[in-house]
Amino acid sequence: MFESAEIGHAIDDDTYEAALPSLREALLEAQIDLHEQAKRQIIVLINGIEGAGKGETVKLLSEWMDPRLIEVRTFDQQTDEELAHPPVWRYWRQLPAKGRMGIFFGNWYSQMLQGRVHGQYKDAVLDQAISGAERLEKMLCDEGALIFKFWFHLSKKQMKLRLKTLKDDPLHSWRISPLDWQQSKTYDKFVRFGERVLRRTSRDYAPWHVIEGVDANYRSLTVGRLLLEGMQAALNKVEPESSALTIGPLAIHNNERTLLDSLDLSLHLSKEDYQHELIAEQARLSGNLRDKRMKSHALVAVFEGNDAAGKGGAIRRVAAALDPRQYAIVPIAAPTQDERAQPYLWRFWRQIPARGKFTIFDRSWYGRVLVERVEGFCSESDWKRAYAEINDFEEQLTEAGVVVVKFWLAIDEQTQLERFQEREKIPFKRYKITEDDWRNRKKWPDYRQAVGDMVDRTSTEIAPWTLIEANDKRWARVKVLRTINEALEKAFARDKKK
């Protein structure tokens, strides 16, 4: 795979100087056009052999284009904060906004290669990391990202010659880093595993470009031209019409039973039983979150449900059991301008708690397959694709020790109507009812179908949905608390078996 990058590609100075002005002008123009469109973020992944010109090339790119629109990120040793989160959390936080370019050193490929080369894990774990990288990049590209992956290459002979030349030069020996010497000892393994990674992850939506790094002129022009070609192709790509205009009618089957129809909404608790069970479950939750085993876990609770189903009341009863320093409540509304400039999961990744912490999502990433689907705020392909993306997201969370509990609070139409009318009559509850609530009520069958599809496609063994019979608020609140406690205790029990 690397043979063509070891044959001595070179460009003389005259040819380089003649080609450079037009290339710089075209790159800057394409960069500005993409920034003005603000439809795509550009992600440039820098990998390869030490000393092959990675840093020098990125420095040139910052000179050729507007550096104010470029963010260079280096992912070296993980910080304590990063170690307390799922592995890809650090990359999601640093994604550039649409219209901007992010250049990533030490990215996910660097981490997986270093881990395998130095024996931190075996081939099976490397293959898992490769599959995870493919899924991440596919999702980013589906959300509009433009990904360039560069492998800067030197042959083993060229690398050793470079090190010897620099070592013997008193003025430039400082340019040799400890990583240079380290890689000179592991070159064969690094290239062997690098070839495996490139072969598995070079896709039409995010291909690898292998750059011979010996000649600076050739290296610089080649990278610049590849960037220009990709950026111009993105600018010339014909986008489909707005999803709000093209989405077809939803396939609603009003006469078919769904999981929601199987719920016994008459379930209830007496006031006396409620007080007893509520206090017991709150005490249980408080103890579970203080348990030393929580140091290996984080907790995420997702609350979805019909309007007026009592999500807020259930959340307050959960929070009442805890020290405010232990948890955060994240209400999810329509995305802000900054959030629209990112892939839709970005705003949720940023809120994932560190180990030992608890985050409550009042509405969540499931908006993509609920309100966005029903109201036509995204395309049909977007929400259909989202089921797999959400399952992958939640799998990454659980693999990192996050306990994910998901609640759908269900009420019937008559109960919702009564609660709406009550909110309109009581002054201190009036803020809870809006025109949108009444409008959404008219789409009850549409939402019922969307909820059924959501549960069918995203209730998994690792992150199952819990359907809460919420006509009786007391029953719902206790069931929510009990479910959270059971999920935590199951996670603690699994820890013992490891």
From Swiss-Prot:
One GO BP: polyphosphate metabolic process
Domain of life per record: Bacteria
As recorded in UniProt, its EC number(s) are 2.7.4.33
The record's Gene3D superfamilies line, in alphabetical order, gives: P-loop containing nucleotide triphosphate hydrolases (3.40.50.300)
UniProt cross-references to InterPro entries, sorted A to Z: P-loop_NTPase, PolyP_AMP_Tfrase, PPK2-related
State if DNA-binding is listed as a keyword: no
Which Pfam family, any one of them, does this sequence belong to?
Answer: PPK2
The reactions it catalyses are:
[phosphate](n) + ADP = [phosphate](n+1) + AMP
Task: Return the broad EC class.
Answer: transferase
Similarity-based family: Belongs to the polyphosphate kinase 2 (PPK2) family. Class II subfamily.
Task: Quote the function comment for this protein.
Answer: Uses inorganic polyphosphate (polyP) as a donor to convert AMP to ADP. Can also convert GMP to GDP, with lower efficiency.
The record's listing under NCBIfam families reads: poly_P_AMP_trns (TIGR03708)
What's the protein here called? Polyphosphate:AMP phosphotransferase
Q: Which organism is it from?
A: Pseudomonas syringae pv. tomato (strain ATCC BAA-871 / DC3000)
